[in-house]
Amino acid sequence: MEGRKRIAVVGSDARQAAAGRALARAGYAVAGAEQVARADVILLPLPLDESRTPLAQLLRAAKPGAFALGGRLSAQAVEIARQAGVELADYFARPELAVYNAIPTAEGCIGILLQQRTRTLWGAEVLVLGFGPVGQALAVRLSALGAGVTVCARRPEQRALAESLGLRAAPLTALAGLAPAFDTVVNTIPAPVLGDGVLARLRSGSLIVD
C-alpha cells in the first residue's frame, strides 16, 4: 500500500469523479483535496477556475517534489505553482485530449439545439464558426443528422478539410454576408466574432449558441 502513488483529485464534477475511479482501478491510491499534503500527484479540474479552487492554498500544502496537472492553465496559476515549488503541467495542451474533449462538447451543443429549436435539425441550415477540434466534431455530427452545414473558418486548410468532408465552407471575412441564410449559428471560436453588424443581419428568431 505504501509503495503506491498517491493522487489527490481536486474537484467534484463528473469528469473528476470519472478520473478518480479510473485511477483507482489502475492501482493508484486516490483521495480528495483534503489529502493534498500527502499526494505525489495533484489532479486539478478542467478548466481550472481559480475563483472556486484555492490554488495557492492547495499548492503551498503540497509536499516537496509533488507534481500537479491542470487544464487551461492561466499565467497566474503557473506563477502560483512556481512560487510554491510545485511542477505544474497543462494536460489540455496535449492535442489528443483536445480531440477527445471535443466529442462531449459537440454532443452537448447538439443537445442544446434539440432542446431550443422548434423544428428538427434534419433540413436545418446551420452555420458553424471555427473548424478546430470542436468545430470539426460538431459539423460532421450535424451533417450526419441531416442538417445543411456551412463552416466559416479563417485558415484555408480548415476550409479545405471541411469541403473534403462534404461540408460547405467560407472564410470568416464572409460572415456578415452569409448571416441572413441561417437560422442557427454555433460559434466554436474562443473569441467574440458575432458583432452587432452580423447579429443585425441574422434572421429574426435565429438561435445562436456561443
Regions found by a protein language model. Name each.
Residues 2, 43-123:
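Glycine/serine-rich phosphate-binding loop and adjoining beta1-alpha1 elements at the start
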Residues 7, 29-30, 88, 149, ...:
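Hydrophobic anchor at the start of a short beta-strand
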Residues 8-18, 23, 122-143:
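Glycine-rich adenosine-cofactor-binding loop
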Residues 13, 74, 154-155:
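Residues in the short beta-alpha loop(s) of Rossmann-like NAD(P)-binding domains
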Residues 21, 59-60, 79, 140, ...:
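Alpha-helical segments flanking ligand/cofactor-binding loops in enzyme cores
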Residues 25-26, 64, 83-86, 145, ...:
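Short, structured coil segments at secondary-structure junctions
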Residues 47-67, 165-209:
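Rossmann-like adenosine-cofactor binding region
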